[in-house]
UniProtKB/Swiss-Prot annotation:
NCBIfam families: PRK05254.1-1, PRK05254.1-2, PRK05254.1-4, PRK05254.1-5, ung. This is Uracil-DNA glycosylase. Keywords: Cytoplasm, DNA damage, DNA repair, Hydrolase. It catalyses: Hydrolyzes single-stranded DNA or mismatched double-stranded DNA and polynucleotides, releasing free uracil. InterPro entries: UDG_fam1, Ura-DNA_Glyclase_AS, Uracil-DNA_glycosylase-like, Uracil-DNA_glycosylase-like_sf. Its main location: cytoplasm. It is found in: Cytoplasm. GO terms for molecular function: uracil DNA N-glycosylase activity. Belongs to the uracil-DNA glycosylase (UDG) superfamily. UNG family. It is an enzyme of class 3 (hydrolase). It comes from Klebsiella pneumoniae subsp. pneumoniae (strain ATCC 700721 / MGH 78578). GO terms for cellular component: cytoplasm. The active site is at D64 (proton acceptor).
Length: 229
């Protein structure tokens, strides 16, 4: 069941909180001082732009944005067209290939088509300094994304939360399992994928859950915008 509420409706007050204004101010000051911050300012809130609150069917929690040039564009795990597919996403594609009939591994890592179908690709920290993983982890983003998760938990029904790795699982501890579907596995990173991400069957289980609820399943084959027109 969807909610008529929008992100603006439920986050307007949060965005006026002193901690949040301070987060934005710190990021803006770092950019102005010449520090390269990813993703570009216009892309920081893309996860919310591409997936409205009332359209959320699935939440995939990431952690930090990618910190290499041209990679991050505001959607967790996704990279811009033309950028090499990162190892964790490649492992996600391998799991899809092994479990979703007809899935063929794409040559790009751009996941906007997932987001447009209701997959909220949410990093728990929304900015990072170039080349410095977790450099913005203590700026206040975690407080904001905790609030986002709590709002989805409260206002939406029957959302599938894919929690990969201990960080995502801690963030998702508040989710009401009576109202939502929570699936846990190790992170798809090469460091942990062989400990149970491969074979977790989460993409299949997600679609089965949606179909059982009378909803349209996700087409997990990522399509570039030009291909879908």
């Amino acid at each position: 069941m969807t909610t008529p509420l929008t992100w603006h409706d439920v986050l307007a007050d949060e965005k006026q909180q002193p901690y949040f204004l301070n987060t934005l101010k710190t990021v803006a000051e770092e950019r102005q001082s010449g520090i390269t911050i990813y993703p570009p300012q216009k892309d920081v809130f893309n996860a919310f732009r591409f997936t409205e609150l009332g359209d959320v069917k699935v939440v995939i929690l990431g952690q930090d944005p990618y910190h290499g040039p041209g990679q991050a564009h505001g959607l967790a795990f996704s990279v811009r067209p033309g950028v090499a597919i990162p190892p964790s996403l490649l492992n996600m594609y391998k799991e899809l290939e092994a479990t979703i009939p007809g899935f063929t591994r794409p040559t790009h890592g751009y996941l906007e088509s997932w987001a447009r179908q209701g997959v909220l690709l949410l990093n728990t920290v929304l900015t990072v300094r170039a080349g410095q993983a977790h450099s913005h982890a203590s700026l206040g983003w975690e407080t904001f994304t905790d609030k986002v998760i709590a709002l989805i938990n409260e206002h939406c029904e029957g959302v599938v939360f894919l929690l990969w790795g201990s960080h995502a699982q801690k963030k998702g501890a508040i989710i009401d399992r009576q109202r939502h579907c929570v699936l846990k596995a190790p992170h798809p990173s090469p460091l942990s994928a062989h400990r149970g991400f491969f074979g977790c069957n989460h993409f299949v289980q997600t679609n089965q859950w949606l179909v059982d609820r009378g909803e349209t399943p996700i087409d997990w084959m990522p399509v570039l915008p030009a291909e879908s027109e």
